[in-house]
Regions:
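A glycine-anchored, Pro-Gly-centered beta-turn/N-cap motif
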Residues: 4-6, 10, 15-18
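Primarily secretory-pathway and cell-envelope proteins
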Residues: 1-2, 25-71
Length: 71
Protein backbone atom coordinates (compact mmCIF):
# COMPACT_ATOMS: atom_id res chain seq x y z
CA UNK A 1 0.00 0.00 0.00
CA UNK A 2 1.23 3.51 -0.76
CA UNK A 3 0.01 7.10 -0.44
CA UNK A 4 1.03 10.37 -2.08
CA UNK A 5 -0.31 13.95 -1.97
CA UNK A 6 -3.89 14.01 -0.74
CA UNK A 7 -6.03 12.98 2.21
CA UNK A 8 -6.37 9.24 2.80
CA UNK A 9 -8.92 7.47 5.01
CA UNK A 10 -7.08 4.77 6.95
CA UNK A 11 -8.93 1.47 6.78
CA UNK A 12 -10.75 2.54 3.61
CA UNK A 13 -8.27 4.12 1.15
CA UNK A 14 -5.07 2.76 2.71
CA UNK A 15 -4.24 0.05 5.26
CA UNK A 16 -3.34 0.85 8.85
CA UNK A 17 0.36 0.51 9.65
CA UNK A 18 3.69 2.27 9.36
CA UNK A 19 4.50 4.24 6.21
CA UNK A 20 7.88 5.64 5.18
CA UNK A 21 8.84 8.14 2.49
CA UNK A 22 10.29 6.46 -0.60
CA UNK A 23 12.67 9.36 -1.20
CA UNK A 24 14.25 12.08 0.91
CA UNK A 25 11.69 14.85 1.42
CA UNK A 26 12.22 18.59 1.01
CA UNK A 27 11.42 21.37 3.47
CA UNK A 28 8.08 21.77 1.64
CA UNK A 29 6.83 18.38 2.91
CA UNK A 30 3.96 18.44 5.42
CA UNK A 31 2.14 15.43 6.84
CA UNK A 32 -0.79 15.23 9.23
CA UNK A 33 -2.79 12.56 11.06
CA UNK A 34 -6.27 13.60 12.16
CA UNK A 35 -9.55 12.23 13.46
CA UNK A 36 -12.44 14.38 12.31
CA UNK A 37 -11.37 18.00 12.82
CA UNK A 38 -8.77 17.15 15.49
CA UNK A 39 -5.10 16.95 14.50
CA UNK A 40 -3.50 14.01 16.32
CA UNK A 41 0.04 14.53 15.00
CA UNK A 42 1.74 16.57 12.27
CA UNK A 43 5.19 17.59 11.11
CA UNK A 44 7.23 19.52 8.55
CA UNK A 45 10.26 17.19 8.60
CA UNK A 46 12.57 19.37 6.47
CA UNK A 47 14.44 16.39 5.01
CA UNK A 48 15.24 12.72 5.47
CA UNK A 49 12.85 9.79 5.18
CA UNK A 50 9.97 10.42 7.59
CA UNK A 51 8.09 7.45 9.01
CA UNK A 52 4.48 7.68 10.20
CA UNK A 53 2.19 5.11 11.87
CA UNK A 54 -1.55 5.40 11.20
CA UNK A 55 -4.55 3.51 12.59
CA UNK A 56 -8.01 2.64 11.30
CA UNK A 57 -10.41 5.59 11.53
CA UNK A 58 -7.71 8.22 11.10
CA UNK A 59 -7.08 10.50 8.13
CA UNK A 60 -3.56 10.74 6.71
CA UNK A 61 -2.75 13.93 4.81
CA UNK A 62 0.36 14.41 2.66
CA UNK A 63 1.49 17.61 0.93
CA UNK A 64 4.66 17.85 -1.18
CA UNK A 65 6.12 14.67 0.37
CA UNK A 66 6.25 12.36 -2.63
CA UNK A 67 5.11 8.79 -2.02
CA UNK A 68 4.99 6.96 1.31
CA UNK A 69 4.92 3.14 1.21
CA UNK A 70 3.72 0.77 3.93
CA UNK A 71 6.62 -1.01 5.59
Amino acid sequence: TSASDGVWQVGKDIDAGTYRANNSVTDRCYWEISVGDDIVQNDIPGGGYPQVTVSDGQQFKLQNCGTFTKQ
